[in-house]
Amino acid sequence: MSKTFDLGVLYSRSGTYQLLSEALFTGAMSAIESVNANHDLPVSFNPIVRDPAGELTNYAPMCAEILSSSNAKHVVGCVTSSSRKEVIPELDRAQATLWYNVPYEGFETSARVVYSHAATNQNILPLLGWATRHFGMSVYLVGSNYIWGWETCRVMRTRLEAADGSVLGERYLPLGDTSVESLIEDIEKSRPKFILNSLVGASSYAFIKAYAELGQRDPYFASDNCPLLSCNLTEAELPVLGNAAEGLISVGPSFRKNPTSNGEGSSLERTAFQSVLTLAEALAHGASGPFDSYLAQHGARYGIDPATQHKSLDVHIAQVRNSAFKILHSWSDIAPDPYLTRPSRHPKFSDPMLKVVQA
């Protein structure tokens, strides 16, 4: 007989990062439907859905309400690192687990979180290594003004400067800010070899569109010469970007060659889907009590590192061509290293670092 488990679903259906949330929500709910339709599984899920509407202050109380008003011990949710950090105290109090399905900046482990998407050595490092080999050693850093933007740019800056590269500019915008004119002007003056875009949601879309216009005015900023790079752009956001997305370079655990108009098949959707299936399998195998104790013994079965509760992932660098991602470089099964203390887990390049000759 199937046992039904309450499962929290905590994604914003509106707000500046709505497209990301919608992809994650779709993946999670599709997986719940799949589990419930699979009569060979001895478990099913009752989703307890809450919508924080993109407001940071809503996450902790809504997470607490899920955990106190139901029997849920697992929550699939959160997009920003700020929201993830907001809910961890509530998870601690309830001995519950968050399945976090978004790329993030690393430098965190929590017994209350399964980090299912890319960490620092699975996104920032391979992207930087690839970009410096193909475009050069000077970068302009752009990010949203919270921990994701700060830490992504910090790691990029530290690594690049250690390799005798240079950061020509570093700017941050509040979440949702779409005033990018002065930012574009500064980039135009600085003329870097590439730009790392760590903006999120509406800010990112405004910046990408403005940069595409700059590339039309000045061939130096064409995508084949001075590209925009991202650690978090997926198929879920391509429809809203239209032609402005052409030439963008991103990194992720998977890309779909022919995404549908609604972003179906993005790594966000697939990661959320897989997290729910993994949880169902773990519960079917008798997982009970604090989930970190179960992962300490059985995490490797699911590709989860018991020491950090991060997943091993494939890593792909891809570029948007004709409204779809084309994979440029890949690594298989990269183990997580969120604190960047295990160089053996960092993606390697078979070619030596290119020496860029300045005219």
Label the predicted regions.
Residues V49-L56, V102-P103, S116-L125, G143-C153, ...:
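Hinge/beta->alpha junction and helix N-cap segments in small-molecule ligand-binding domains
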Residues N38-G54, S110-R112, L160-D177:
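Short beta-strand elements in bilobed, periplasmic/extracellular small-molecule ligand-binding domains
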